[in-house]
Amino acid sequence: FVPFRSPSIAALPRRKESVAFAQELWRDLLTHWQPRLLITIDTGTFANLQSILLSQAGARSADHEHFPTGWGEYQAEAVRIARPGIAPAVTLARLPHLSRFALFGRPASRPHMDRLLSRLAQGLADR
């Protein structure tokens, strides 16, 4: 989301200005590019992109679902945002950070990831 390298958002130099720049960048990008699926790995990026998408004319949240991950209380989530008259609906998903949580190939996470991935694929198949 923020196009500047940093080990974490907390360590990002000039964080406030960097996030403001990223919000404007994505706002402009999403007026010209109409993705059907966006996947994030942190809550801040998810919240920022959701806010930007919902600020588009006529956009509305069609459904929001949380998914267990097999890592205790850590969850993934997906929200479908309808954009009538603008573009096809977009599904915005958030996973726990993949460098910290092995979600794919881990037996305890497999049924949960299968359910999430099925939901994301359904969003791509819907017209």
Q: Which role fits each region the language model picked out?
A:
Residues 9-27, 47-127:
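C-terminal capping/extension of enzyme domains
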Residues 1-11:
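Short, surface-exposed acidic-centric catalytic microdomains
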Residues 3-4, 38-49:
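A short beta-strand-loop-alpha-helix capping motif that often carries His-Thr
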Residues 26-43:
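Proline-aspartate-enriched helix->loop->beta-strand connector
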Residues 2, 34, 95-97:
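Hydrophobic alpha-helix-in-membranes signature
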